[in-house]
A protein has these predicted regions:
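Nucleotide-activated sugar donor-binding and catalytic core shared by glycosyltransferases
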Residues: 1-191
Length: 191
C-alpha cells in the first residue's frame, strides 16, 4: 500500500525501518522555520514588561472555549503582578473575536497579533507560554520557552474522543517522550 513515506520526526525512522517500509526523514516545517526578516518590536512591547504568549486555538470552537479561561488567567495574574504583557497569537479569522472579548473584560495589558513573523519574534522573547494542545506546542518547545498546555471541549465530545483515542497525553511533546515533559491542564483541570 505504501511505496515510500516521508517522516516528520527522526525517531519515526526506526519504526518504519523495522517494518521494511521505505522512508526518508524530511523534518517538520515548524521546527525548521526561521524568520527571514526581523520586525522592530520596540513599538509593540514596552521595555518594562515581561511577555507571556497565549494561544487560544485557530478554530472558533477552540477559541470560544479557551479564551474565557485565558482571560480569567490574565485577571488572576494581574491581581498579583503588574509587570507582564499578555500577547495573544491570533489568526486573521479569530483576531476580531479575541479583541472584542478583551474589550468586554476591560483588560489593558494585552495585545493581539496575527502577523506570522511578529508572532515568531514575540514567542522567542516570551518568558512563558500557555497554549492549546496542538502543533503550536512544537513551536514553543523549539523556542525553548517554558509552557503549559490547556485543552477543553464539550463534555460529550470529550467522552467520544477519549473512547477512540487511547493515549496518555494530549501534547505531542509528551506523547513523543511518553511522559509529562510539558504540564497539561485538560478538560476539568482547565478552568
Amino acid at each position: 500500500f505504501l511505496d515510500h513515506i516521508l517522516l516528520l520526526f527522526n525517531f519515526e525512522k526506526k519504526y518504519f525501518d523495522k517494518e521494511n517500509i521505505n522512508n526518508t526523514f524530511v523534518g517538520h516545517p515548524l521546527l525548521e522555520k526561521n524568520a527571514k526578516s526581523k520586525t522592530d518590536l520596540s513599538n509593540l512591547i514596552p521595555k518594562d514588561k515581561k511577555i507571556i504568549s497565549l494561544f487560544a486555538g485557530s478554530r472558533s470552537s477552540e477559541t470560544s472555549v479557551l479564551l474565557p479561561i485565558l482571560l480569567d488567567f490574565i485577571k488572576l495574574m494581574n491581581d498579583k503582578f503588574n509587570d507582564y504583557l499578555f500577547v495573544f497569537h491570533a489568526t486573521e479569522e479569530n483576531k476580531n473575536y479575541i479583541n472584542d472579548n478583551i474589550k468586554l473584560a476591560n483588560l489593558d495589558n494585552i495585545q493581539v497579533i496575527s502577523d506570522e513573523n511578529v508572532k515568531s519574534q514575540i514567542l522567542s522573547n516570551s518568558v512563558f507560554a500557555v497554549s492549546k494542545s496542538g502543533t503550536v506546542s512544537l513551536e514553543i518547545c523549539n523556542a525553548k520557552i517554558p509552557s503549559i498546555v490547556i485543552y477543553k471541549m464539550n463534555f460529550l465530545n470529550f467522552i467520544f474522543v477519549k473512547s477512540l483515542v487511547k493515549i496518555k497525553y494530549a501534547n505531542i511533546i509528551n506523547i513523543i517522550n511518553n511522559k509529562e515533559v510539558i504540564p497539561e491542564l485538560i478538560q476539568n483541570e482547565c478552568n
